[in-house]
A protein has these predicted regions:
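PDZ-domain C-terminal substructure recognizer with occasional recognition of PDZ-binding tails
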Residues: 10-52
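A domain-start/cap signature at the N-terminus of enzymes
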Residues: 43-97, 173, 180, 231-236, ...
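Gly/Ser-rich "nucleophile elbow"/oxyanion-hole loop immediately N-terminal to the catalytic nucleophile
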Residues: 89-96, 140-173
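Short substrate-entry loop that stabilizes the transition state in hydrolases
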Residues: 91-141
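Alpha/beta-hydrolase fold active-site loops
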Residues: 98, 127, 165, 213-215
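Cell-envelope and extracellular/periplasmic
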Residues: 104-108, 136, 156-159, 171, ...
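Primarily recognizes the serine-hydrolase "nucleophile elbow" in alpha/beta-hydrolase
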Residues: 164-212
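The feature captures the conserved acid-bearing segment of alpha/beta-hydrolase catalytic domains
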Residues: 191-269
């Protein structure tokens, strides 16, 4: 690509991230034993969500399942918080899995409901659902950003995580913490999806960086008293070149909207 050799897939993101939208470059491939070169141009990351996205089956050569699946406790000895991960039965160590970190609303953590909502998506789309809890169920505190980061690092030690599909997803107070985590952990988080949550006004939000790109999905109720402030904050993110996708929702997402959110997550690894 652009006369640079590709050794590993991550090289592609690094090379393409060095171009501004609208830049032209060449790509050379070997097709049926013959070299081919074509010209392409870059564009800004789209904010539309595909209505359909084909399931990609794992390669037949993917390693067999040697890891523990199901509901896995994730306990950090130095932290009082509880955490559990849902690892799909379809997990294979040779297949990178996206990671969805669910951050619950204040005082509302229902593990059974979460498993019911996400299990089929985890199996079909190669996702692991990480469910950390606030130390005090009634509310998250800003310092728990560090705890959630540790929990993410812990699950990455045991399972093969697709670094391009690490998403923090929160509702209400959990969504506020999701924004804090996403913008403070730019080296790690590639997507933030919130429902009925505002970007904290004092949060330091840097311009989007091509080599540490971050996509935003925000669902809200247009009749909410917070709607105007939330819209202004999202405009600021767009001005800073973040791809922002917005949806309307009263309360949490409907089942169809969760399906769409999963497709949004699945597009985060696009070039």
């Amino acid at each position: 690509i652009a006369e640079k050799n590709i050794s590993v897939p991550d090289d592609v993101y690094t090379i393409l991230g060095s171009f501004e939208p609208g830049s032209k470059f060449s790509i050379s491939v070997i097709k049926s034993g013959q070299p081919e070169t074509t010209s392409l141009s870059t564009s800004a990351l789209p904010t539309q969500i595909p209505k359909e996205l084909p399931l990609v089956p794992p390669l037949e050569t993917a390693a067999d399942n040697l890891a523990i699946t199901g509901l896995i406790p994730v306990k950090l000895p130095e932290e009082p918080n509880e955490c559990v991960a849902l690892v799909p039965e379809s997990y294979k160590t040779g297949v990178p899995h996206g990671l969805v970190v669910w951050l619950h609303p204040s005082g509302q953590f229902n593990q059974a409901r979460l498993v019911k909502r996400w299990q089929r998506h985890c199996n079909a789309r190669h996702l692991i659902l990480l469910m950390p809890q606030a130390a005090k169920q009634k509310r998250w505190v800003p310092t728990e950003v560090d705890y959630v980061r540790k929990a993410i690092d812990e699950i990455r030690k045991s399972y093969r995580i697709d670094d391009t599909r690490i998403v923090v997803h929160g509702h209400q107070a959990g969504g506020v913490l999701a924004y804090m985590l996403a913008f403070s952990q730019r080296d790690l988080i590639r997507g933030v999806a919130t429902v009925d949550a505002e970007v904290p006004q004092r949060l330091n939000v840097p311009a989007n960086a091509p080599l540490q790109r971050l996509a935003v999905y925000a669902a809200s109720d247009s009749e909410s008293p917070r709607a105007a402030r939330a819209a202004a904050a999202l405009k600021r993110l767009r001005d800073l070149q973040y791809p922002v996708t917005t949806r309307q929702s009263k309360g949490y997402l409907s089942e169809m909207q969760v399906d769409e959110l999963v497709r949004w997550i699945d597009t985060l690894d696009r070039l």
